[in-house]
Amino acid sequence: MTDEKLNDHTVKAPEYLPDILTVESLDMEAQGIAHRADGKVVFIEGALPFERVTANVYRKKSSFEKAVVMAIHRESSQRVRPACPHFGLHTGACGGCKMQHLHVGAQVAVKQRVLEDNLWHIGKVKADNLLRPIEGPAWGYRYRARLSVRYVRKKNAVLVGFHERKSSYVADMTECHVVPRHVSDMLVPLRELIAGMDARETLPQIELACGDTVTAMVLRHMEPLSSGDLARLRAFAVSHPGLQWWLQPGGLDSVKLLDEGVPELSYDLPEFGITMPFKPTDFTQVNPHINQVLVSRALRLLAVQPHERVIDWFCGLGNFTLPLATCAREVLGIEGSEALVARSCQNFKKNQPASQSRSALSATEFVARNLFEMTPAMLVKDGMADKWLVDPPREGAFELFKSLAALHQQMVTGVPCDDGEQQQSLVLGDWTPPQRIVYVSCNPATLARDAGVLVESGAYRCTLAGVVNMFPHTAHVESIAVFERG
């Protein structure tokens, strides 16, 4: 993977004269929003709310314009000096962060507004109350990352890091403040390692995954590695204790350890006495500090009682399922992947105490189900549950909530719901909808859409909603919402 340029490309000169504008707010991409006298919207990179700035417009459309801040005439009290020298609007700036120039408390406020705006404008939903934001360390939090690799033949140099802002080029990074310190300290040695490898031109990326005590790096290689390269990787691991190399010659199913017999990756949920083993290609939360607080908060919001049955939808490896098994009578974890279901079962068995030193986990079952093709009949088949925990990917849980709303309508009106195959009344027996749902979301737009389905049906109201600052200094909005039946 060669690149004949080492961040020496120039910025295209602006096509329009600068304008002085007053910034009103930030959008979901952390761009300042201003309006011209005629009402036309201008999105300004690098500008903050309440600032008065000179902005260079570089793109004009009929309904909006794009600009970049050139000078600040009135500065926001929330503007701070970025911690990282690679952050900014300059040529070659890293695109991994978007908000380092904004105080972290103000970042959370912006994300809260984004959540509320999405709930209202997309779902026509307004939460009864706002949750206190879940916050944690602002730096060194990112335990998962995909680092791009580029060999620059003319310079005989290697770049390892995130992409440049608004570019496919790899940023010339020597440090990173959002990954753990020991990973940041490895960036320059990694560049030197790869520059000396025989396969340096065919190594496109490194997938980073940190556990509590082990750091895994998955090296994607497009051709077989020489014995010399394997020896170089092993020597690098020896010089960086706790590091293990995984190799990926093809798709995800090709990932394997360079050397067996090393400690497994895992993270702890100490409040619940749970240890979660995982592989570097598994989905785990990027921010382990926030994850611990999020799991604790979600279970408190569910308020699970010892006699209750709970379903954990999109359960993954059991991040919420196993803690739920410490307090519920019975738990059902449902996931789309058969492989993940098998791994969840393994994690459950590993955490089931062999002695009486602590309480056993409750009866827990894991099943595979295509959650993007849910029907009312499938919901009834999974049985009644007192509470639900829903933690979907960015696509959300639309079919799940649509099926739940349809069953509610059948119960209220007696009109048959569409079970996806035939139009007929389902025999519900003693099935009833869950009394409470806690929804953990990584996309406020799909959360708002799904919330609208529930609330419009008349079955539920949104009692609580709030943000989870899982990704400080980025525009990513993680959130949590609570829905109460009746």
From Swiss-Prot:
MF term (GO), any: rRNA (uridine-C5-)-methyltransferase activity
Active site positions, chain numbering: 442 (nucleophile)
Segments forming domain TRAM: 10-71
Catalytic reaction list: uridine(1939) in 23S rRNA + S-adenosyl-L-methionine = 5-methyluridine(1939) in 23S rRNA + S-adenosyl-L-homocysteine + H(+)
EC number: 2.1.1.190
Protein's job: Catalyzes the formation of 5-methyl-uridine at position 1939 (m5U1939) in 23S rRNA.
Similarity comment text for this entry: Belongs to the class I-like SAM-binding methyltransferase superfamily. RNA M5U methyltransferase family. RlmD subfamily.
Binding residues annotated for S-adenosyl-L-methionine, in chain numbering: 285, 314, 319, 335, 370, 391
Record keywords: 4Fe-4S, Iron, Iron-sulfur, Metal-binding, Methyltransferase, rRNA processing, S-adenosyl-L-methionine, Transferase
Listed name of the protein: 23S rRNA (uracil(1939)-C(5))-methyltransferase RlmD
Positions annotated to bind [4Fe-4S] cluster: 84, 94, 97, 176
One GO BP annotation of this record: rRNA base methylation
EC class of the enzyme, as a word: transferase
Pfam families, per database record: tRNA_U5-meth_tr
PROSITE patterns (alphabetical): SAM_MT_RNA_M5U, TRMA_2
InterPro entries: 23S_rRNA_MeTrfase_RlmD (IPR001566), MeTrfase_TrmA_CS (IPR030391), NA-bd_OB-fold (IPR012340), SAM-dependent_MTases_sf (IPR029063), U5_MeTrfase_fam (IPR010280)
Top-level division of the source organism's lineage: Bacteria
